[in-house]
Amino acid sequence: MAHWIDIAFCVGCNYQPRAASLAATLREAYPDATVTLTPTGGGRFELSVDGTLVFSKEALGRHLVPGEALALLTRQLSH
């Protein structure tokens, strides 16, 4: 089953380079998944898998740490 991974990022905060870098990493790790970038605002940086939010900068008050996105996706996709 192919999965859908979405990265929502704040344009005004200049999070696009961070989102694009993460998208490239995720496309390499999950070549069968569809990885999309969704421009938003309000300081958001969110990672969703198949419609389920797995990371929210707003909720946690921080950005992803290195390796965290892959760990979150591995955990979510193993269910």
Model regions: which residues?
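Domain-level signature for proteins that mediate thiol-based redox and metal-cofactor handling
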Residues: 1-79
